[in-house]
Amino acid sequence: PAVYAKGFMGPIYATQATCHLCDIMLRDSAHIQMFEAEWRNRKGRRQGKPEFVPAYTMEDAMGVIQNFVPCPYEKIITPAPGISVRFVDAGHLLGSASIELTIQEDGEEKKIVFSGDIGNLHQPLIKDPTYLHDADYVVMESTYGDRSHGERPDYVAILSEVIQRTFDRGGNV
């Protein structure tokens, strides 16, 4: 919404899940920002401070939401000639994605992959990550990239234990 408020009116490509979340989240964020601006300005006027302007308004949030283009996983989108984009499941959180960007110019093709966290295999509720191949460049978040994660906990056994303890105490699940 902040770039929309400054005049950007182009399409915003995002996964379908991100589009759904942003519809709710951006309006909520705008509401919070407007409330905070009102509070800060009320307090600031008494102290002679300049007016606080929120990063964006509800109108900006509602406007930018109209520019979102939902992109299903695996579908190749062509936002401009010579450029194709494919969102794939990163398997990290519901709706997370890695992005494969292919650029063709002067008869050459370059593939760039952008990703945040990539999930583990065989997680409950979350699909395994889609692995991308033959990238020329990879731009990636790597907070825990220098660590070996070792053995993965047996989540089913842990959940079963919690359920059994709850029943043993007479609780409800």
Predicted regions and their residues:
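His/Asp/Glu-rich metal-coordinating catalytic cores
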Residues: 1-172
